[in-house]
Amino acid sequence: MRLDSLLNLEKDNWKRTLVIIFFAQLTSAVGFSTIFPFLPLYVAELGSTTGLKLEFLAGAVFSAQALTMMLTSPFWGVLADRYGRKVMVVRANAGGAISILLMAFAQSAEQLVLLRALQGMLSGVISANNALVASVAPRRHTGLAMGLLQVGSGVGFALGPLLGGMIADWYGYRTVFYVTAGLLLFSVLLVLVGVYEEKDPEEKSSQRVHFLQVWKQAFNRTGVPAAYTLRFLASLGRMLLVPIIPLFIVSLSALSMSENTFTGLVVGVSSATTTVSAIFLGRLADRVGSRKVVLVCAMLTSLLFIPQFFITEGWQILLLQALVGIGVGGITPGISALLAGLSLHGEEGAAFGLDNAIDAGGRMVAPLVGSAVAVWFSLRAVFLANGVIYLLAGVLTGWLLLKQKGNGSRRRVSAPQG
């Protein structure tokens, strides 16, 4: 697809919506991730007013956001189908801006945890963006569209921590929250001005359907429960190493740089390969089917974790994690394209709201599982556990391929395919 084609400015052109949402996703990803590097340090600076241990509160600032997002995302998804997906994109960015701005005025670590919980309740930008793009992109281009959104979030999450760390060093922690809120408000303006969404008359009937009925309908679509299981496994696999990688790198000898710098390099390189591969594998999914791409990427990723059990030098984990990033770049947008193809037109909000809740559940559980495996067995055993998770994802995808043929792209007909 040529760039000049993507930049067609007609109001009803899906490519224009995709380009606007791509930049909005990039901006919001930078904004949300600027606070990641120093949140535990900010917790220590604020201190506790209730006597709770700072180690517990440092973990709670992450888990609280994931928990509330898991609980509220399905409701936001249904509301998106009823009242418009553009409105939900604006709501998610504005809600994130308000909650993060308030964090600059927190007076205790407990207040910060509550505000992070509020952020989880009000935000959910990625799922809102996915639902909007899935509702307008033609079936044959869903893989490309989801790949582009993955690129936007990948670049944003790679740049954000670097920007946040520099601002925190130069101007203090609280300034970062002001900058983040400003970036999210810019995304709000970008979507308000640049995105045009026309309400489909056929969707009005869904406004009288109860939340539970909408969710039941979504789960009853052939293949959707399997797609959600894939999302949970992918989220679990993606986040399992988060508490382990820094500790494992410290255990390696003869590093050419500090452990902190090398940890950042490993994470950054993996994110970079994920971002680059997402666009190419997304386009490939449009041609051969998202199931096939997810299957191959999951199986290869599973195999790549086996040699990581035997790593003895830093360059080895750097190389293998870079290759893992390529696989993840095909899995994440591939599952989004698969889900878009399995859900009916007009139900994208509900489908991706549930999807975001399941992803948040995986993010919440993964660090606990990774830590438990490390305690019960060893740090190296976590790599094998990760390989098993991706192997299960590959087996499940293979079962989907055998059960139902199709390319997993979104369609505008009554019978779901994918």
Model feature map: region roles:
Residues 2-14, 197-229, 415-418:
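Juxtamembrane intracellular "pre-TM" segments in multi-pass secondary transporters
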Residues 38-55, 244-261:
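Short amphipathic helix-loop junctions that connect adjacent transmembrane helices
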Residues 60-76, 268-280:
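Central cavity-lining transmembrane alpha-helices of secondary-active solute carriers
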Residues 71-107, 285-291:
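Conserved MFS/SLC helix-loop-helix module at the cytosolic interface between two early adjacent transmembrane helices
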Residues 99, 111-124, 316-330:
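Hydrophobic core of transmembrane alpha-helices in multi-pass small-molecule transporters
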Residues 115-153, 338:
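Cytoplasmic helix-loop-helix junction between adjacent transmembrane helices
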Residues 176-192, 383-399:
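Symmetry-related core transmembrane helices of the 12-TM Major Facilitator Superfamily/SLC fold
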Residues 188-205, 399-410:
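Helix-loop junctions on the cytosolic side of multi-pass membrane transporters
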